């Protein structure tokens, strides 16, 4: 996790101390560039140019760090684009470490995980839709079944009777019940997931997404071991609720935090409020797996709190992190136990009589 003494901040603090003279806490900008040259401070041409163009008369350690990690100090167009993708979900204090991490990238185009997952999902959908021979692209569950009479599940779909084929607990994320379903998921996961992956790295966002998908099928089977499952909604919900975790983790450093909370609250209210209304008031037989959504939300919030970057970690936040890790581990373990002990086509724990 990033801290107030992250490795990049330590480097910039050391450089600033090398540039100081005597007991200075602020350095005159008029002398800063010449000091960098004479004292052989290893800054890039872009960073030196940004220092020369800075309007301030004096600069302290915080100002120095912001200048050398600013967009103006970055000459690479690709990396400036990456800054723009990451900045909306970061606090100002996160940007120093994240921009520095982006500067250290030696490959492109990032972020590879969300792009790769999306390409595979789109490719599989159109491959199976083409082989289905003329079925409606908007409603065809492409690849879900070997035959159109729905008697033989495809190799990716999660089917309760095939729970022994463990890959199905995750592979169902590659299938979608029509183009509308596919577009809804891939658009959101690209808009939400790419900034998260740029800011928080592939080895943080990848596990959140994949654990959410797996948790979605585990919870679905635990509650309703009669239903087939397709779609990446659990992973998408994990990305959305990882934003919630990010805001909570960096609450004091996060700009526009109340606006972020309001937007997320409205989304949650509309989605889950609609599901509750359909379940208890209209008695509609809803085919959407809200259980997978819930599992994704739990993963994004609790596991996200554990693994996402924290700019300044306070003692209480460290305690909360361990509590979240315990709660999520208990949730995950409980669903696994249910999968082991409950047989396919057992009675639903939450049954809607209209859907029997």
Swiss-Prot record:
Which keywords does UniProt give here? Hydrolase, Membrane, Protease, Serine protease, Transmembrane, Transmembrane helix
Question: In terms of one coarse class, where is the protein primarily found?
Answer: membrane
Q: Which reaction does it catalyse?
A: Cleaves type-1 transmembrane domains using a catalytic dyad composed of serine and histidine that are contributed by different transmembrane domains
The UniProt entry lists membrane topology as: Multi-pass membrane protein
Report the Gene3D superfamilies cross-referenced here.
Answer: Rhomboid-like (1.20.1540.10)
Q: Where in the cell is it found?
A: Membrane
What Enzyme Commission number(s) apply to this enzyme?
3.4.21.105
Recall the GO molecular function terms of this protein's record.
serine-type endopeptidase activity
Role description: Serine protease which activates lin-3 isoform a in the proximal vulva precursor cells (VPC) during vulva development to transmit the inductive anchor cell signal to the distal VPCs.
According to UniProt, the name of this protein is Rhomboid-related protein 1
- Its gene is rom-1
